[in-house]
UniProtKB/Swiss-Prot annotation:
Protein keywords: Membrane, Receptor, Transmembrane, Transmembrane helix
PANTHER family: MEMBRANE-SPANNING 4-DOMAINS SUBFAMILY A MEMBER 14 (PTHR23320:SF10), MEMBRANE-SPANNING 4-DOMAINS SUBFAMILY A MS4A -RELATED (PTHR23320)
Subcellular localization: Membrane
Biased amino acid composition, Low complexity: 337-348
Pfam families: CD20
Compositionally biased spans, kind Basic and acidic residues: 224-234, 469-478, 580-601
Species: Homo sapiens (Human)
Protein's recorded name: Membrane-spanning 4-domains subfamily A member 14
SS bonds (residue pairs): none
Source taxonomy: Eukaryota, Metazoa, Chordata, Craniata, Vertebrata
Amino acid sequence: MESTSQDRRATHVITIKPNETVLTAFPYRPHSSLLDFLKGEPRVLGATQILLALIIVGFGTIFALNYIGFSQRLPLVVLTGYPFWGALIFILTGYLTVTDKKSKLLGQGVTGMNVISSLVAITGITFTILSYRHQDKYCQMPSFEEICVFSRTLFIVLFFLPSDVTQNSEQPAPEENDQLQFVLQEEFSSDDSTTNAQSVIFGGYAFFKLTLSRSPLVSQPGNKGREFVPDEQKQSILPSPKFSEEEIEPLPPTLEKKPSENMSIQLDSTFKQMKDEDLQSAIVQPSQMQTKLLQDQAASLQVFPSHSALKLEDISPEDLPSQALPVEGLSEQTMPSKSTSSHVKQSSNLTANDLPPQGILSQDTSSQDMLFHDMTSQDMQSLDMLSQDTPSHAMPPQDIPSQDMLSQALSAHAILPEASTSHIVQFPEIQHLLQQPPDLQPENTEPQNQQILQMSYQDIRSEVMEETKEWKSEEELHRRKSSRRHSLNQQTKALQYLRRHSLDVQAKGQKSSKRHSLDQQSKGWQSPKQKSLDQQIKDWLSPKRHSVDKQAQLNQTKEQLPDQQAEDQQAKGEQYPEGQSKDGQVKDQQTDKEQNSKKQTQDQQTEDQPAQEKKSPKGQFQNVQAEGQQAQVEKVPKLLCQDSESQIQQYQFWQFHKGNLQAGQPRTVNLLAKNPLTG
């Protein structure tokens, strides 16, 4: 597709025979308006809201300064503070509308703010209307001291200016008014019968979208009925509401008499290339041109199925030789008669005069392009397009930028984008048959009709193949995208799994190492403390046991002498008082031992507490150690008491059997051997 900025003029040359009716349609470009521009443009809406907020703030400041400078009464709008808080709401709404990012929450917020801003605007209008009630009689007259001038100007700007802008924008530019020019060249028979041509054109607006479908040029006369046009060649026409209509005044056709030549209708129009995205529905209102020729013969029906327009590149006249003008066309059969077959062509910036059709040789090419060679041009002159009234035997020159017609003219041609290869198909056989007199028509019409059907079938098949190729390419792209997305999802899942696994391993290693270190630390702290406590207890008990043993031995040695003397003197009846005295001594010794053990346990507790506070580095093991120490401290006096009690019992047993020692010495020796004094 070409760029739309270039304006070109193009011409269709349609060669037909007399007694024919040509039905053609002419499209128009849709007119842009302010509403279409603002539709779907949130940035423009936000910018207008911000500008209106600034205007309202400006008016509010003017009224406030007027009150300060001239001490006049403020209107109700300014007293309510609408110029300030209303402007703030408008600015916030405009900012959010401009910075609207495609998210659901933000879209809902922008919609809510727009609703709030509309309500604020309605309140501002009501305040402005109510403020007129509190003004004096000068409010009805133009006064620079009151609010009337400012409010009126504001209403004028807000209500009248946008309507003027829309009206001006909806008026089409003069360049958009397409012009139709017809040049009728009549082919006269040998009788030189007079003919008259009359054209009627109905203009209108057409809104359409360019598609791959191809529309034929249909010519309908009146008597032989109507031939069937294939559905593939018809363009689907959808109705849409008209915005406006224009009637184009037809130019008076010029009749140029050329013996042994065809009657050509040249359609000269100026087009602007239109994009596929801007056009959505198609309405083609065909402009009818009826040529009523006064002849006795009945009109014959002719159908010219032209599947696509011819496309030529811009060729300057300097590059073209005078006797070899390349023109893109179709393969055409040479007939014995002087009249050439009907053809539809699109020329490109060619200026040629006096082009007789006798010296034209046609060549059939595989690319469906035909180059007409050896066209002898005599007396080549540069004539203007406006000089159509002067009859001459030469074709008028034409300033034709031809590349625009592929994208704009739907009158008798279909439009294809550059992505699809355009096939140029014509049926010269039908044209020759219809242009020849009845006597010269060949008999082999059936094979020619079969060839025509085959060509149309091949053309339709090529179109279907092109569309299927496009669909296949789209499917392949979709598959590639889906495979890429699947691979990316798998990669992301694998990375996430590896990361989670590594994090789990690290966490487990850290936990296990921490637990192991804590266990080792607790064991390391507990083991030396337990050993130290055991050693302290043993060290504390061992001297006590030695002291108790020594005291017991001393008591025994001391008591043996008086006991022996007493036993000798009082052998018979003095054992009981001696037992009482001995029991008193034993009780005294027990009390002394208990006091000493209590003092020692208290000293040990006072010494163990600071030592344990110094040795415990962590607060986690302090409670455990304190409990162990308390249990051990509680066990120490119990052990001491048990040892002392055992020693007392042994001592009592020894004293009890002392009397027996004197009576039977061998028996006491055996008892002493069995029960020795051990701490």
